[in-house]
Each structure stands twice: as structure tokens, then as C-alpha cells.
Amino acid sequence: MLDTPWSDGVPGISQGQIRPGCIFTFTWKATQHGSFFYHAHSSSQINDGLYGPIVIHPASSTPAPYGLITQDAKSLAAIQAAEKTRMPLLISDWRHIESGYEWESSRNSGVENPCFDSILVNGKGRVNCLSKEQQAALITPTRQMLLGLVPGSSLTDKSCLPPSVITILAAPGAPPPNFTAIPPNFFNGCRETAGSTEVIKITQESASDETWVMFDLIGSLSLQTIQFSLDELTMYVIAADGNYIEPETVQSVVITTGQRYTVLVQLTEPKTYAMRISGINDPQILFGNALLDFQIVGETQSTQPTMPYINEVGQNTTASVKFLNPDAIRPYLPDTIPSAADVTHKMTSLVDGQVIYWAFNETILPLDTEDFSPLLFGPQPGRRDNHTITNPSGNVWVDYIMQVPNLQPPHPMHIHGRHFYVLGKGEGPFPWANVAEAQAANSSAFNLVNPQLRDTFPTPAGGPKGSWLVLRRRSDNPGVWLMHCHTQSHIQGGMSMIIQDSIATLPEVPTEYSSWKC
């Protein structure tokens, strides 16, 4: 969102609320290419389906990594054709519960709700209800261990860990739960449906042609981290969060909420291939699917079912299945970054008084912030507090050190305004004052040569000793931006911070934005 911070879409930060019945038009400069998605930043409206894909095609002069996949001219031409017809796959976790009701009920019970009804692909999917026998066949050692914490407990009919187990997993400091305030349909009441299935149809006109397809896998997820695979087909991962990477050849891609990956697939045999999406969060067995229908004119399509690479809980079906390792991603044509940052910010995540209130810097962002007049319309150069970072103006490099001090789930960190470089991560505390000190103590934990460029990346899960993640980002894009965990219940619970970047050179907000009322 370069040079148009007023179109960043965060109420109370960069714009006013868009009330029901109102119309608001965003105008912005598309200076980047790749896969993105628009979504609500008000309350939990993203849980109610307020999201959609944005795919920006690269200029013809943009260097692409296709030559690292093949040097064959015919194949390269087919890949270029696939790029022009690339298709978004919007992957979502879905509840049959209105988000406001779900949030208030979780506040009243003190129990975070990790259960969903289905996985959707481009808005299509179905509810799958497993029998006790099917659950037993799929239960992972970790889920079995967690159930053992409460003797006699078992998965609910939604294949969720029961509330009695979920509360044990709550971070330290949470008050006792009120189980009687949990609506019965949150964890139970699975009703199988015969919903629609997304079918992608690809037709090759001649047997002598060559067909590649490009998919933008978009994690428009509320909570789930998922594994995505295409039966019998190998994927070339060519971009992460809109940025080209050195191609990774895999059979399954892990996607957290907010992340996007672009993949290339070559099709040679006419079949209907299953796309499999499996949630890998411990609290629930959740899965969905879509179909890729490939036909060649004049040839008979195979009717044999395709063989899966992963099962319903995201485990590999054979030892040869290769999973994407997000830590191993390297940029295509890496940028040069400075050896040290100009500014360092250290932040600690924790639960603030109740399990649904998550703090980013030991302080939650006030939950009514979205109702305020946008800070962008009146930035405060001297504002520095536990939920506001004000960086110096100019071409300043800033390190953000995310500290997770105890048992917590991964937090997919997302920063508006500029992508960031993932420098390193680790287990235990981060006792050093900055990255230079940490490098001197443990140089192998950091990459300043060719770090990946992302806009969403998870902290490591916090164990008994905690964990940390280090991100480096330029603050040269004038604006008031949001930094937040992309887990929806966490951002709604206050796990966000405000970043003021280069506000001394902030352009004047257009009148159609500053004077807009509804």
C-alpha cells in the first residue's frame, strides 16, 4: 500500500467504520504483483465471510523464476500462459455461528472456541461428521496425549477436543472457565451436509499441447493452519505472500492464516484430481476438498480415483511425500539488507486477564479503537506507549523481536504498509539487546544474506521455555499501520499494535477520505 495509506482499510487507524448500508470506494496504487486478499478488520467480520481474493499480474519485464524449473521453450511458453490465467483458491475455515454471538459467548464462558464446521474452497464445501471409529483411526499422538490430561475425555461429535481439555491448554493467567455458558453447538452438534464442491475445469485442446496451471493458495483462515495437496501431482511453489522465491518442489504446502503461496502444476494425464485440505491444529480434526477436472480433447479421462499424498489430519500417506519447509524458503533475486537495524523493538505476547484477550506488548490494543477517529487523519509524532510504535522518518530499518514467554500457539504475525524480512527464530528466551548481540552468541540462528520477504509469518509455538521470532522491516512508507496476529480471535482480543512510519513526510489525506462520513 505504497503512497496510499488512507486505503489500508483498518478502522480507527487509517479510515472510519463502514456502517451497514454505506458504500465506500478504495482507490490505491498497485505497485506490487502477486497474490493477496481483501478482508474486514472490524470485529470478527472476516469470520462471517467478508473477504475475497486479489491477484495482481506482474509486468512483462518482471524477472520470474520459471527458468529454474525448466529450460524447455515449449514448457516455458505453457507456464507463461498459465500465469495469464492463474486462479485463486480461497481457503477458509467456516462456522455455522454468527461471529458476534460466538465472541460474546466465548467472553462469557472464558473458553476460546477452536471448533469449526467445515473447510471452504472459494466459498464451497461441506460438513464432515466422523464416527467414533473414524476418529480413533485418525487421532494423532498429540491429541491422544491431550485427551489423557482429562481422564475419560474423548473427541466431541465435531471431532474437537472438549472444553475441559481446551481450558488446560489456556496460557497461564487465565481465570477459571464457566462451562455452563458455552452454547451446546460450539463443540457438539455435528450435522453432515451435502454442500457444493469447487471444481476447476481445465481442457487441453490437443494431445501435442502442454498444460500447466497456476494456483494462488490464499489462507483466508480464521484460526486453522492447513496442509494443502493435489493427489498424484507435484507442485512447484514459486511465490510466498506475493514475492517470487526459488522454486520448491513439494507435494504438500502448509498455510497459516493470512499467508499466500503461488504454485505451478504440470498436467499430463486426463483425470479428476482431488485437492485435499487438512487442518493441523491440535484442537480439531477438520478437512475439506475441491476437484481439478483435467481433460484432453480426443482422449478418454481416467475414472480411477486418485491416490492422496496426505490424509484427513495432514499426515503423509507414504514416506516419499515432500512437505514445504517454510523456514527453507529463499527469495528469487534476493535484496541486500543492512547488517544492522537503526531501531530495535522487543515485544512480549501474553494472555491479558482472560483467555480471549491476547496482548502483543504486554498490553492489549483497546477494543474500541476501531470506533475512534482514524489516527492517520491526525498522527501524533510523540506517541510512544505499550501499543504504539513511532519510528523515525526516512529510510530507517527496524527490527521487531517477538517474544513468546510460555506455552502459547504460534501467532501468525502480519504487518501492514511494508513486507518484512524473516531474519531468524528460536526456542527459549531472547536475552540479547539486539540482533547483533544475538548473532555474536548464535550466528547460525540468523540469515542476513538471503532472508525471505513476507508479510505474514508465525512465531514458533511457545514451549515451557518460550520462543522468539525476529523480523526486519523498512519504515520508509509514510503511514499509520497495524501490526497484528492474524488469528482472528487474537486480533479481536487485542493482539495488535499501531506503527507510525515516517509521519513527518506523510502526504495529505485526500478530502474524499478525510471528510467521508456514514
Where are these regions (language model features)?
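Extracytoplasmic beta-sandwich strand-turn segments characteristic of Greek-key/jelly-roll folds
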Residues: 1-31, 60-75, 185-206, 235-268, ...
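Histidine- and aromatic-rich segments of cupredoxin/plastocyanin-like copper-binding domains
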Residues: 3-11, 17-19, 93, 98, ...
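Short coil/turn segments at secondary-structure boundaries
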Residues: 7-9, 41-42, 52, 102-103, ...
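Active-site-adjacent, His/Asp/Glu-enriched structural segments that form or flank metal-binding
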Residues: 20-22, 30-38, 42-46, 56
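Short solvent-exposed strand-capping/beta-turn motif centered on an Asx-Ser/Thr pair
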Residues: 33, 218-223, 403-407
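Extended terminal and domain-junction accessory segments
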Residues: 50-109, 212, 245-399, 403-410, ...
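A short beta-turn/strand-edge loop motif at beta-sheet boundaries
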Residues: 225-227, 407-412
